């Protein structure tokens, strides 16, 4: 996708960010953090440790992700996040706490007749106020067919990322 020379994969614990990166170093941060808040009850997680860490913020909280992102982003840098709709209030409060101004959001619906489970949100560091809720994404239509919009996303996302 012609970004091979602009993307560098770093396999490191994000909590070491101050040892690796400078403040205000990035123009854009995109994150798909664990969706579920960990309450301390291990029975709420999957038996497989990798899946538990991927689904529950056991080792890294949502607040840590947003705080670190704010530190790393340049002024007017873009922060994009995917999260569970049920955590909307928490996400908005944390973004504003760390000077990431919510700018636009899309709700995602698995089916046209169900509530939104996932939200996509973009915030800008140190931006002026102004927020829009964009047209939603429906994964499946009323005939249980994958939505044309989703099909086109899959077709256009032929990512080729080079690991270093």
Predicted regions and their residues:
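SAM/dcSAM-binding transferase cores
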Residues: 116-164
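Short helix-capping segments at alpha-helix termini
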Residues: 1-5, 97-100
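Amphipathic alpha-helical repeat scaffolds
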Residues: 1, 31-36
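Conserved Class I SAM-dependent methyltransferase catalytic core
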Residues: 58-116, 120
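A short acidic, Gly/Pro-enriched loop at the edge of an enzyme's catalytic core
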Residues: 16-29, 37
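Mobile active-site "lid"/loop adjacent to the S-adenosyl-L-methionine
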Residues: 35-64
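Residue-level signal for inorganic ion chemistry
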Residues: 32, 65, 123
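Conserved SAM-binding strand-loop segment of SAM-dependent methyltransferases
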Residues: 2-19
């Amino acid at each position: 996708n012609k970004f091979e020379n602009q993307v560098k994969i770093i396999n490191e614990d994000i909590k070491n960010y101050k040892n690796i990166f400078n403040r205000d170093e990035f123009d854009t941060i995109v994150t798909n953090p664990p969706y579920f808040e960990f309450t301390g009850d291990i029975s709420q997680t999957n038996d497989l440790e990798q899946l538990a860490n991927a689904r529950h913020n056991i080792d890294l909280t949502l607040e840590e992700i947003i705080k670190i992102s704010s530190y790393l982003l340049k002024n007017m840098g873009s922060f994009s996040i995917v999260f569970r709709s049920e955590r909307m209030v928490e996400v908005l409060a944390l973004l504003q706490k760390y000077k990431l101004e919510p700018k636009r959001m899309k709700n995602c619906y698995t089916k046209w007749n169900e509530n939104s489970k996932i939200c996509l949100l973009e915030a800008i560091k140190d931006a002026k106020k102004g927020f829009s809720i964009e047209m939603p994404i429906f994964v499946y239509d009323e005939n249980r067919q994958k939505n044309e919009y989703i099909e086109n996303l899959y077709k256009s996302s032929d990512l080729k990322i080079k690991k270093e």
